[in-house]
């Protein structure tokens, strides 16, 4: 178990730990280099096979696709943002069946979406270590998903992000393959888009990268397409209502959701004592109901927060599915979160939210919603995340998050609650 300091951050590793990290990075680099060389050979063969063929730009005038595959093998928030591609394609090609290929850990959030004909899951992360090559179950899983994809006979495949998505776009047998040229292997894409995500010096949001690909696939993009929208099934709302009734959450008090954890970097988390201070004030002084969200793996961090609290909050971490989490965030009056998947879910279901950013740049990965308020301290080293590894502080201080104090977050929460709960404003006036 990782030891954390009083703020909930890992300490600076010793020399042995740092050396181990370097050796792991070196082995991964060697493996990826070998893979790159092999895939370049495959790409050259693909290019030779279509040499002399001319492809007209994709549009409703030149193609009428029956089946389209969208591939996003990434975290929950990235998948939510990638649904902008699905929306634009479905509007442009209303008669097409659109399938989504996603990670098993993320796919549930969009499984009930009416714009999708099918959601297929696959996790390529099993191949991250060389020993995976000797495990038969990994080969069987890969062959199974490839057979399923090829059986669908896709007309267009959109590789939204990464080399694995590009490889699976080729493996699907799709006639036209759309993706960023510098995120796929040479020769893999028939309709290549120049550049890549996170180009140096380019401050485009993830949604804008997604919409670049949608345009290349022939979609007509409107300004409204920049706002991600997430479908929440009625069954998920009903299941959530039962859960809230069981734990004792009522409808007559403000409901504040707090997501204290974050994937892909511990520096994206707000400090543990700050969470405890904020929640104590919301429950004790404002009479709000606070619900803590998260996965089962987030429980140790949540328990740290709760151990420092004087008031009581509702801990629903590990008790909701992703669909129920979306219903919970839709039901909440406000979400407070760092840069996380639930932050993007809340934005996509139309919930007011406060997004606390430190190492990551909200211009790249912030919530896209008129109801979102972004807080960041803007110290000299922030943002520092470059997408080459987890968002961890190289100075082991995470000062960018420590500078955002609970009083500021509380002030914004109260602003967002005043319209719905007028008595909150009157009680503040009396104070």
Enumerate the language-model features and the residues they cover.
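Catalytic machinery of carbohydrate-active enzymes
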Residues: 1-431
